[in-house]
């Protein structure tokens, strides 16, 4: 049931009636990041119920923020794409993210660690440039996490396609990364660096594999600085 509006003519109030309902802003984050299919959107908001996700998408469609389209090449599959109106919200979402990055207490943000969301965020922001000349596999392990969500595999293909697996894909692993979830989340957010957390992170692989991981995931100095200002893919 939709909450009553603010009943003010102010544009901030009117926009807030749509954008500030529960889950809407993080759903927009996923849409702006490039997710268009229902299951991919769910991976970005794993704690959001499918029913509520469908409802929020319908509300955004009714407001002209997203447009539902048939997927090319997949009969019976539909996708939700941002309209021009929706694309204009990129700067709004990025501004909120940048403010949160600078102003929200680090200890508070690290209370909400989630391995599935962390790895999904890594997968969509991983930039394999230049792409490898052969398939490259990086396995991440979080020993303190229960078994079903303990290990993840990032698979980078020679043409640049990136896949995330939560079950062993059966490929040869080029680099093993083992650390606790809180540490990796802090590194990924740019709150600390791989060098500063060296005692907590175990890397097992060739120097070339380590170099690729650092470059692709932005674990170098430039990547850390970039993450201090929130940007979506």
Where are the predicted features?
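Short, intrinsically disordered low-complexity segments
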Residues: 1, 28, 36, 41, ...
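A generic alpha-helix surface/boundary motif
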Residues: 9-10, 178
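N-terminal helix-turn-helix DNA-binding core of bacterial DNA-binding proteins
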Residues: 10-48
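A local structural micro-motif
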Residues: 24, 68-69
């Amino acid at each position: 049931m939709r909450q009553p509006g603010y009943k003010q003519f102010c544009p901030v109030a009117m926009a807030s009636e749509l954008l500030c309902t529960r889950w809407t802003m993080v759903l927009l984050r996923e849409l702006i990041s490039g997710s268009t299919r229902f299951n991919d959107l769910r991976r970005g908001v794993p704690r959001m119920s499918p029913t509520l996700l469908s409802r929020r998408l319908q509300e955004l469609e009714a407001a002209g923020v997203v447009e539902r389209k048939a997927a090319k090449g997949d009969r019976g599959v539909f996708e939700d794409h941002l309209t021009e109106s929706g694309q204009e919200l990129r700067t709004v979402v990025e501004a909120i993210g940048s403010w949160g990055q600078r102003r929200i207490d680090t200890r508070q943000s690290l209370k909400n660690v989630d391995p599935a969301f962390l790895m999904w965020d890594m997968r969509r922001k991983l930039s394999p440039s230049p792409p490898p000349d052969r398939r490259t596999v990086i396995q991440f392990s979080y020993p303190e996490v229960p078994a079903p969500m303990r290990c993840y595999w990032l698979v980078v293909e020679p043409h640049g396609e990136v896949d995330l697996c939560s079950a062993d894909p059966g490929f040869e692993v080029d680099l093993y990364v083992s650390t606790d979830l809180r540490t990796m989340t802090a590194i990924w957010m740019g709150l600390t660096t791989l060098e500063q957390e060296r005692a907590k992170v175990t890397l097992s692989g060739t120097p070339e594999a380590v170099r690729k991981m650092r470059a692709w995931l932005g674990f170098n100095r430039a990547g850390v600085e970039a993450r201090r200002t929130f940007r979506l893919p």
